[in-house]
Each structure stands twice: as C-alpha cells, then as structure tokens.
Amino acid sequence: MIDMETIRAAAARLVAAATSPTRVILFGSYARGTADEGSDLDLMVIEREVPDRAAEYMRLMDAVGRIAPGVGVDLLIYPLSEYERRGQVPGTLLFEARSEGQVLHDALP
C-alpha cells in the first residue's frame, strides 16, 4: 500500500506534465479508504481540452512513473466538457469520481 504523501506527489507530477490540467481526482479504493495490498491507484485527470487522448495518456503515464512495487496505476483522462456532462449521470465512472473522489488538484473557479 502507499500513503497520501506518495499519492499527492504523483498528482503533482501529473499537474506538471499535463497540457491543461484543471482537476486531478483520486477515486476508487484509495479514495474510499478501503485499499489493501492488491489495490491499484485510480487517478482521473481533467483537462480543458484533450485533442489526442492516447498521446496525452502516454505522456502522463511517463510522468507518474512507478509509484511503488506492486502498485499499478489506472489513469483516466477526460476533457472538462465531458467530465461536466457525464459526471452528472449516476452509474458512470465520472459520476463516481465526482461524487466520491478526493480532489488532489483544482484549478477551476
């Protein structure tokens, strides 16, 4: 398992590397406080625009790097417009992250 200091450091690396970061959200078991030794780290990056999601994903995964032995990273990237639209729909991952996630970076007014 990893601690919040390690998670916040990973989020800071994402913010530094992202093209137009508006929000970084921790979701899943680490956000709920139910993480165990087999848990991965679920992070969502919201950017103003994401013209090439695949390229941005590769850049951000490189920036996050290896968190800790045996800890995988699930990284999701969404443009702000999609986050705002689909984050209102119950049952979606965006809704879960928006309602239960922990915001680690917020540049929205």
Description of each model-found segment:
Residues 42-46:
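Short beta-strand->loop micro-motif that forms the acidic, two-metal-ion catalytic signature
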Residues 1-23, 32-37, 47-109:
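Catalytic core of pol beta-like nucleotidyltransferases
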Residues 29:
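Conserved H-loop
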